[in-house]
């Protein structure tokens, strides 16, 4: 079995972490499906750990797991890792920027700037519905990502 050093030698020139940013129902997961990529997804990790993608009682454990898996992907040389979660505030995004700096890679944000009412309407047609009041609270908390946070690129999807 190869050691970590051999994996590091296979690294691509500049690895990237790409964070999805936006409300539930804004199109983050659909966007990634269309790209044909498998992201590190907070919903998928919740489902894996608790057999329930809506279980918010394990929030810290879910994001700790995502960051662990992200670091492992960087160490073995994966060129791009997409992270699918809401990432509403600079504080929620900061750990990924720190990881990117530690590993010498770029970190980008893809911001889904979709009106709240459209997100609520889309969300109401899902299997796992986030209550409208929770969506409103999330929208009030949402701070659009900026390059000043440490992103090498911010892409806005409308």
Regions found by a protein language model. Name each.
Residues 72-76, 102-104, 148:
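Conserved catalytic network of the ASCE P-loop NTPase/AAA+ motor domain
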Residues 26-81, 91, 116-120:
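Conserved substrate/cofactor phosphate-moiety recognition/catalytic segment
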Residues 48, 52, 87-128, 137-146:
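ATP-dependent NMP and nucleoside kinases share a basic, alpha-helical "lid"
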Residues 2-21, 26-29, 34, 38, ...:
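Conserved GTP-binding G-domain of TRAFAC-class P-loop NTPases and closely related GTPase folds
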Residues 16-18, 79-83, 107:
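Generic beta-sheet signal
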